[in-house]
Amino acid sequence: MTRPRAAMRARVVGLVFTVGLAGLRAVVWAAESASDPRRSGFDFMTPELQAMQRDDALNPGMLWIKDGEALWNRNVGTADRSCASCHGAATATMRGVAARYPAFDTASGRPVTLSQRINLCRVERQRAPAFGFESDELLALEGYLAHQSRGQPLAPPSDPRLEPFRARGERLFRQRIGQLDFSCAQCHDEQAGKRLAGSAIPQAHPTGYPIYRLEWQGLGSLERRLRGCMSGVRAEPFAYGAPELVELELYLAQRAAGLRIETPAVRP
């Protein structure tokens, strides 16, 4: 056999092996998914919305991701530093980071969300003003970081310091609130898959935040979604950044551990 033909055969064998390995991984992933009763909100959407999320050229949330990339590399504050000045290229250093939030912050002695960590770094390292809650800048940067972990499983820390906060989050999830006297669990555990006001009730796994919601016509945080649910049962929403919301996020992350990150997800 001539060398060119041998090289071509080696390339073909390598390609077949690579494709076969990818197929095997897909089969294993599908088998894992089939045995797990938990489902992402993606599985409850129409085929049209699923297609919108899958295609980055159609996914409107990608506009914020692009803005987040620019913010990551922009020098700001009296320190005249960018996020990249400390962390380098996000594509290399941030993969898997969002999957581990909320995480324990030693300085404050409590858990912080990814958006809170961004603002802590901004104030302490860049010497710049904190972004406002739900601002386009904060959502863009949080979205950009979470996007680096797309396809990675949620991996909440097993830090024992988080346990009392996570336990409080679970109690909040199961506590009846508001004039309608409803809990998160009653909707998202007991009624998941049924329909409410024309939309499917999801299991409430935070796999795609920040998400683009058609209802919002923009990107929004998990805190915004939680506050919206509280208003929906006619309860007084917690303030943005409230410890209760962080504790609830901490529990939700544990409840969804192992499910894949989708950011930016698209929802109705």
Language-model segment annotations:
Residues 75-76, 176-178:
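Short coil/turn linking the two alpha-helices of tandem helical-hairpin repeats
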Residues 72, 172-173:
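Conserved short C-terminal alpha-helix that flanks the catalytic cleft of nucleotide-sugar-dependent
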Residues 94-101, 196-202:
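Short cysteine/histidine-rich zinc-coordinating motifs and their immediately flanking basic loops
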Residues 2-65, 92, 102-167, 193, ...:
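Post-cleavage N-terminal segment of exported redox proteins
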Residues 80-91, 141, 169, 179-191, ...:
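The canonical Cys-X-X-Cys-His
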Residues 54-85:
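N-terminal, post-signal-peptide region of Sec/Tat-exported proteins
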Residues 185-215, 219:
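An amphipathic alpha-helical core segment
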Residues 79-84, 197-200, 266:
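Extended intrinsically disordered, low-complexity coil regions enriched in Ser, Thr, Gly, Ala
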